[in-house]
Amino acid sequence: MSIEQLKEQIPDFAKDVRLNLSSMASDESLSPQAKYGLFVACAIATRNPTVTAALEAVAAAHLSAAALTAAKTAAALMAMNNVYYRFVHLATNKEYATMPARLRMNAIANPGVDKADFELWSLAVSAINGCGTCIDAHERVLKEAGVSAASIQTAVRFAAIIQSVAVAIEAAAVTVPLAAE
């Protein structure tokens, strides 16, 4: 499925979402690997199979097998880490912050692609999943690696757009009879 075909599934009440998707698709401010890895990782984070299939198909033409796998890995690891570290952050009992996580996450240290790209994908997924601790950690690593604030903002903007595409498509699938006027 192409971006155009995905746009056709977005209902008229979400015209702004369609326009944002078009803008995202034509944005060239990130490297192709960073951009299309974001498409994959963020689409997976939406848990919407239509969006995931479409954006993975688009990205496959621009990513190596290793980069495609790394983007999927970022989404999977953040699904775990975002739940755990959001709990640690939000729990009133701060004892949990002193306990070892005991979660395997070796791929973060050796993702098989440029570390900054993997961190960018992880940051964007963490934004979708709402983990402030993870957002701060990934943003700090990205800044230390010399990634600009504009690139970081672009990644989070892509995450917001991809999430809104998933929600718009899901909302269009729900039909409720309207009360007679």
Curated annotation (Swiss-Prot):
The keyword Nucleotidyltransferase does not apply. The keyword ATP-binding does not apply. The active site is at 131 (proton donor), 134 (cysteine sulfenic acid (-soh) intermediate). It holds the Pfam family CMD. It comes from the Bacteria. Disulfide bonds join 131-134. This is Alkyl hydroperoxide reductase AhpD. It comes from Bradyrhizobium sp. (strain BTAi1 / ATCC BAA-1182). The lineage of its organism: Bacteria, Pseudomonadati, Pseudomonadota, Alphaproteobacteria, Hyphomicrobiales.
